[in-house]
Structure formats: structure tokens, C-alpha cells
Amino acid sequence: VSVRIFSKEKQGSGAFNGGEIVENKPIGFPQEYSPLRPYSNLFYWAHARALKDSTIGLHPHRGFEICSFVLAGEIRHYDTHLNEWRPLRAGDAQVIRSGSGISHSEWMAQGSEMFQIWFDPDLSRTLGKPAGYDDYRLEQFPTQAHGRVTVRLIIGPGSPFWLDTPGVQVYYLQIPAGETHRTELLPEQVLSAYVVKGAVMFNRQAAPSSAFALLAEEPRVETTTIEPSEVFFVLSPSEPGYATYGQGRMRV
């Protein structure tokens, strides 16, 4: 049974363009400091905030599925597959299936925030595939009410957002103060959770705003709010069933 909480101060950090964009990183790149190394089929996770309008220049990717989830404001995306800029706003999401290779650039408006999460879909399969891109709008994601809790399904059965990476489900929870939301976990699943707003307790362990939680070998996760809160959930397999790039890096 394992519940691990990492406050923002205990996460890795980074910046672009002289601090115009700042990041905290629950899962950093292998050469960076972060409290967690890649696990499951999660390779990288950063929470980026734009302090000014700023552009991250064109840069390449291969193999990974790189997802951006817009939390606030507006971002714009350009890549060598689309050859055009596309806007994304709060609640929207995108995936770059980088396959055999693609280059992209991002613009973030002042005050915007997003998660960028890299999933490992088994690079031995995807490095030979053509690259592709999809974006999805907030209104495309189904929502359900669980009592007073609103659950938005971003990735999983019933959502149009698809990944080659197996076994991934992504949810966005809006929870009023004093409520408890229960999530059942299969023995082969892990739950990665980020407190976007507010403050919660995961199985009675406190997690403030911007905290990251990793929960494994827990048959049930109870998320209890201390104040009105928004929480981002990723469910993924504890063992993906293939050799991940992160595992290879850790053996070096």
C-alpha cells in the first residue's frame, strides 16, 4: 500500500525564454532533478505557466505521444505535420503522435497554464510510424455528475481522445468543499494525481495546491476536499507489458 505526496517545492523545476515560461515537474527528464523517475508508461510531466506572452521555438520529437492539457488561458501550436498555427483554450487538449519524427513550436499567452505529459507507447512500435496530431475541444469530452462532484472524461472509453499508449485513462474532477470522491483501482493500476486548484486529502494524506500524488497498491482512493478543488487524474498500468524508454535509461 503506497501513497506518496510531492508538494510543488519538492518537484523539479524549469524555465524557458529567461523565465517567461516557468514549470514545476513531478516527472522530469532523466538528466534533470525531479522526485520521480519515469514509471508505468509515463515518461514526463510538467506544469507550465506563462508569465508573459512567449514562444518556445521549433524543436523535434520522435516516438513518444506528447499530450498538452490546457488548464487556463490560450496556447497555440505549430508543427511540421500541420504547417499552421492552431489555438487551444482552457479545457482543450492535444496529442502529438511523434512517430518517426516531427518538429513543433508552442506559444503561450500571459496567464495561461498547461500540463505537458509524455506517454511511452512502446517506441519499438511507434518509431516506424508516420507522425500525426489531433486536437480536442472541451465540449467534446463527456462529463458525469457523481453527487456534487463533476467528472470530465478526457481519455478513456467514451472519449474521442485516443492514444496508442495502452491502459491510460485521464479525468478532470471538480469537487466542492467537504466532499469525498471514491475511485476504485484495479491491482494492476496506479493513479497519478495533481491538485490543480484547492487542497485535498488522498486517503487521509494532505495534498495542497500544485501537489502531485502517486498511489499504488491501493484498492480504493478517497479524495476528500478541504476547500473547493480541481484535481487531474491519470490511471495507467503498473507494468505496461513492454520495455519503456525510461526503464532503459535507468539501467544505464
Predicted region positions:
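Jelly-roll (double-stranded beta-helix
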Residues: 1-252
